[in-house]
């Protein structure tokens, strides 16, 4: 098994991350800058996987006018770059964390993908993604890419690479789910929107997760925020609760969890071990200002503190 992974980020961003004790609307707010990172959900996943020793190739779209930060990151990390450069600028997302851990996002607009850009991407990506063990498709749709076009591409991709990991929201989530990817990771609110009803109890969440599985999705992982995560597949149902940590930033925590899930699945670990690992990687992410794993012993210690139980 070659254990190669590709991640696709159609709408990446520069994340400007800061800390503001309490945001006051209509006032001047002083913000402590904690970082400016070339990011995007699939890129964050790639960083985690690279730190865990997995060969990763990244793809999607980058704006021509401000691509240098991304190109430098890929070079520094030794990540193979298959991004398609288009006219315009990659967007900037401002993410502010308050003292209570609440994160407020300001997502700016960026480049627009033309029909010719999209046609080229579809043709090119489908020519090389089939060689990978797993493909992770993450994030939102850029301007110019319709949900219908995205569903069509995802469906064609699945015929070439059955193991698609999908993590998105809003219209992109709805569109991608129609292609029945192998693993999906919505949060509880996104699952409620898909189900068209509130899911107040854990049994309601599990019921909705099984409804997704009935559409041909093998693995459904529900992010529960500080409460951890729920994994539902053919083998059972498990709930993992992360250890308590000092929160620095929750930015990229969900992407870190996806990276942990992919790693465990690639290594053919059990569902229990994989969910424990993924929960620990996410907990590690919130305790630092940037995504990544620099201390493997620290990760192992975090794994030992994860509370994982089968759901009865």
From Swiss-Prot:
Cofactor binding note: Can also use Mn(2+) or Co(2+), with lower efficiency.
InterPro entries xref list: 1-PFruKinase, Carboh/pur_kinase_PfkB_CS, PfkB_dom, Ribokinase-like, Tagatose/fructose_Pkinase
Gene Ontology BP terms: fructose catabolic process
ATP-binding recorded as keyword: yes
Binding site for ATP: 223-228, 254-255
Its EC number(s): 2.7.1.56
Entry cofactors: Mg(2+)
Class of this enzyme: transferase
Regulation: Activity is markedly stimulated by KCl. Reversibly inhibited by fructose-1,6- bisphosphate and ADP. Irreversibly inhibited by phenylmethanesulfonyl fluoride (PMSF).
Record SUPFAM superfamilies: Ribokinase-like (SSF53613)
Entries under Pfam families matching the protein: PfkB
Domain of life: Bacteria
Gene Ontology CC terms, in alphabetical order: cytosol
One GO MF term: ATP binding
pH dependence as annotated: Optimum pH is 7.8 in 50 mM Tris-HC1 and 8.5 in 50 mM NH(4)HCO(3).
Complexes and interactors: Homodimer.
NCBIfam families reported for this sequence: 1-PFK (TIGR03168), pfkB (TIGR03828), PRK09513.1 (NF007068)
Similarity comment: family membership: Belongs to the carbohydrate kinase PfkB family.
Protein name: 1-phosphofructokinase
Organism (species): Escherichia coli (strain K12)
